[in-house]
Amino acid sequence: MITNGSITYYHKTLDNNKLPVWNRYVFESVWHFGGKGSNINKGYENANDVNIRIPMEYVEDKNIFTIGDIISIGINPPISKTTDLLYTEFYNVTSVTINEYGNNPHVHLGGK
């Protein structure tokens, strides 16, 4: 699979006090398309949508991917709250598809 960048994936869990904890995962060889200002066929309706494919060879635990998690473009530091990402390009995960079969097994993430 051709790759064109890296992402930082923040998976949300809750601690004993029911407060959010953001677990950080860095994927350095991913394919991503779209994002802020990308407007090819659907105009501004889908201008902030992003699609990311992570080759399965780089995924240690496919169960970390959940709708509502956060994708940040590039390699970014750990966070304790979502406002820590204020000055980075980030997206909320809106879809997760695990494609384990075929020529290019990968995790496909959609975000807004």
Residue ranges and their predicted role:
Residues 20-112:
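Short, conserved turn/kink motifs that form compact alpha/beta structural patches or helix kinks used as
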Residues 1-27:
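Active-site-proximal polar cores
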